[in-house]
Amino acid sequence: MHSFLLATAVPATLSWSPKVAGVMIACNILAIAFGKLTIKQQNVGTPMPSSNFFGGFGLGAVLGTASFGHILGAGVILGLANMGVL
């Protein structure tokens, strides 16, 4: 019973396309820029192998901004799909 109700509450998801990838990449770039401006101690913790490639971020900052970017991207993709843009 519960799984049937859950299945009816989940909207139809979008199949992957270059548009979807572009939106996800844009959201991750936005999240990295937001992290660059707001994280006070960006290089604290485990350093990344090529820190210049990662903008001087430590492992925690990279994981945090990438996670935020993916959460933001999933929301934007679902929102644009519901609006019919994607």
UniProtKB/Swiss-Prot annotation:
Membrane topology: Multi-pass membrane protein
Claim: Glycoprotein is one of the keywords in the record: no
GO BP terms: photosynthesis
Broad class of where this protein is predominantly found: membrane
SUPFAM superfamilies referenced in this protein's UniProt entry, alphabetically: Photosystem I reaction center subunit X, PsaK
Keywords, in A-Z order: Membrane, Photosynthesis, Photosystem I, Thylakoid, Transmembrane, Transmembrane helix
Protein known as: Photosystem I reaction center subunit PsaK 1
Family: Belongs to the PsaG/PsaK family.
Locations listed in the record: Cellular thylakoid membrane
Keyword Transmembrane: yes
Spans through the membrane: 14-34, 61-81
One cellular-component annotation, GO: plasma membrane-derived thylakoid membrane
S-S pairs: none
